Swiss-Prot record:
Pfam families: Guanylate_kin. Gene3D superfamilies: Guanylate Kinase phosphate binding domain, P-loop containing nucleotide triphosphate hydrolases. InterPro entries: GK/Ca_channel_bsu (IPR008145), Guanylate_kin-like_dom (IPR008144), Guanylate_kinase (IPR017665), Guanylate_kinase_CS (IPR020590), P-loop_NTPase (IPR027417). Residues 9-188 form the Guanylate kinase-like domain. It catalyses: GMP + ATP = GDP + ADP. This is Guanylate kinase.
Amino acid sequence: MAEEIERVGRLVVFSAPSGTGKSTIARRVLERFPSMRFSVSATTRPMREGEVDGVNYHFLSKEDFESEIRNGGFIEHEFFFGNHYGTLLQKTREAMAQGTDLLLDLDVKGAMNLKKLFPDSSLLVFLAPPSMDVLKERLQSRKSEDEESLKLRLERARLELGFADRFDTVIINDTLEDAVEAVILAISNFLSTKQTT
């Protein structure tokens, strides 16, 4: 009798401009796929009250983070508002080896890096706004953006949209429920396909 091959976890990556509903859709996906886990990022920022290492973030010293960078320990990393953030390659591999499917929130550069590392085990989903005008309205309705911040987010969105055709699927979030259903269908199809090793 042939030995049964254990299932290897899969990676679902969301990339999207700010204001496209990514966080809301991610919550709905995790509700629909209860065995899927949200990837925990590493950071050098100080732990806040109530946060737990390994749950909210993997909290690393600046020295340890920079050592991981030098040793190729990140799928992606960035320096943002004075702190490093990144996705640890080893933690991702460990989850996959345990058969755990992960949902990752990465920028387009990080998504491209992940696809190079895990071409057959990853689904890249780009969530797009119906138009730049709608995106601008959504960002303004948050009332959390000053004029300069809004301008920067819209410029970044234009750049990110230029990468959309390199993703496995592009979902336009015009109506939230339709977008959620489209994302769930894409993930269901991906998870049901046979993996190549």
